[in-house]
Design a protein with these regions (language model features):
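Conserved PLP-enzyme active-site core in the AAT-like
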Residues: 1-133, 138
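Short, solvent-exposed beta-strand edge segments and adjacent coil->beta transition regions
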Residues: 68-70, 143-145, 202-206
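Hydrophobic side chains in well-ordered alpha-helices
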Residues: 83-84, 155-159, 217-221
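Short, well-ordered beta-strand elements within core beta-sheets of diverse protein domains
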Residues: 103-112, 144-151, 206-210
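Short proline/glycine- and acidic-rich turn/helix-capping motifs at secondary-structure junctions
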Residues: 107, 174-187
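PLP-dependent enzyme catalytic core of the Aspartate aminotransferase-like
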Residues: 113, 181-227
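Conserved small-domain helix->loop->beta segment predominantly found in fold-type I
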Residues: 122-173, 192, 196
Length: 227
């Protein structure tokens, strides 16, 4: 049996206590898999907390430049590793040498990028919380991922189209800042009643904050949200 979590969650930024979840899973004979994409190893290391397997979309923060498509699976259990390696060897989902090089290059600046995106995100959160057009900001206090709800959801197309620096796109974790509308992008395939029941309302936008000059990002958001 498997318990699979991501923490913080996408896009509602809910954090789980990995150690408690691991203990509960192991008590039932299940293994715990943690998606650590949002925090990266800089801000969270699930295996010492009891996770059996950790996965990353390496396309995101690990590579960090929106130019690699890759995934990472990590375990410290030899039996699990042997099974995973057998599957890897027999099915062949390996990265090309160039993609591997790009990912390794990105890892060299991971700590710097995570710290800068966090620094920028904290300033942007402080800015968003003061805007009359924004009714709620969802942020854990670290990392570059922010979600927020707007007062008037009918203005979301205008907000997105008014941005000059921040790009409208589904991805995240790169050096460039992106904005996503979960209703029509990441969660478009989920039935509306299910999506709404989990709090993924139509007024919700998600930001992936990059490493640009934070004043430029704030000016861009101010122009779009006050237009």
């Amino acid at each position: 049996d498997i318990v699979y979590i991501e923490t913080p969650t996408n896009p509602l930024m809910v954090e789980f206590d990995i150690e408690k979840v691991a203990n509960a899973a192991h008590a039932k004979g299940a293994k715990l898999i943690v998606d650590n994409t949002f925090y990266s190893p800089i801000y969270q290391n699930p295996i010492p907390l009891g996770a059996d397997i950790v996965v990353h979309s390496a396309t995101k923060y690990l590579a960090g430049h929106n130019d690699v498509l890759a995934g990472v699976v990590i375990t410290n259990d030899k039996e699990t590793y042997d099974k995973l390696f057998y599957n890897l060897n027999t099915t062949g989902p390996t990265l090309s040498p160039f993609d591997s090089y790009m990912l390794m290059r990105g890892l060299k600046t991971l700590k710097l990028r995570m710290e800068k995106s966090t620094e920028n995100a904290r300033e942007i959160v402080a800015f968003l919380e003061k805007l009359p057009a924004v009714k709620e900001v969802l942020y854990t206090g670290k990392g570059g991922m922010i979600s927020f709800r707007v007062v008037d959801e009918s203005k979301i197309p205008d907000i997105i189209n008014s941005l000059d620096i921040i790009t409208f796109a589904e991805s995240l974790g790169g050096v460039e800042s992106l904005i996503t509308y979960p209703r029509t992008q990441t969660h478009a395939d989920i039935p509306e009643e299910v999506r709404l029941s989990y709090g993924l309302t139509n007024d919700l936008l998600r930001l992936s904050i990059g490493i640009e000059d934070v004043e430029d990002l704030i000016d861009d958001l101010k122009h779009a949200l006050e237009a």
